[in-house]
Amino acid sequence: MTAKNISLDRYKQRFFGDFLELPGLTEIAVNRPGELYTKINGMWEQHAVPLSYEDCYNFARCLAKHHGDNIEDIKPGLSATLESGERCQVIVPPACERDTVSVTIRKPSKIQIPHQGYIDAGFYNRVTNDEKTETHDEELIALYNARNIPLFMEKCVEYGKTLAVAGETGSGKTTFMKMLIQYIPVHLRITTIEDNPEIIFFKHRNYVHLFYPSESSDEKGSVVTPASLLRWNYRMNPDRILLTEVRGAEAWD
């Protein structure tokens, strides 16, 4: 093991070692200094930890160096894998909030499921048209047909349906979206993708604000764009992603 490998392993063990050994753990997320989230059996749990901004940034730099890469303000995102197999996504300012570093670690499953296990669990039911309509869908259809649109919208947000808010400039699209946030269950993990910090969370705690320069989507070669932030989300395991603007290729991601 080289010196840089030893440094990375020491950081991993010091900051995350105890949590990585938790039974059933699938994810670790650090959104800001002093707090860490674990995901076990599909549920997020918050932990207070003595983890500073400098600690998180040093881990990010060490991870980048280990892979012959770099992470800094002009290249603020890195997707990488630890030697022990955990996949990481790290994001530093200005692509996230000032004085924060977003660190997400995904622990690979060691369980091998046989094909029959998938069959018994109904994995192919959607293909064979044997899958029953979800109760949520039936409820939403009933609300829509009854023209109870206010409750229909609230439930769409609660159940995680994809919503697009369209309107002319100054029509209140972002304000309307911010109102709907209150119907997202508070235990879920949320990421936002914004060109300006507009979204404020009052009840939710497990969230990460991601930012891109407003002109970035128009510049060829831009490192931080709505589309790149959306791709970084693939390793951040959010339950909800909020985009304040959809103006380009990110619509297809």
Feature-to-residue mapping (PLM):
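N-terminal accessory targeting/assembly segments
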Residues: 1-84
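Switch/coupling sub-region of P-loop NTPases
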Residues: 142, 150, 155, 161-169, ...
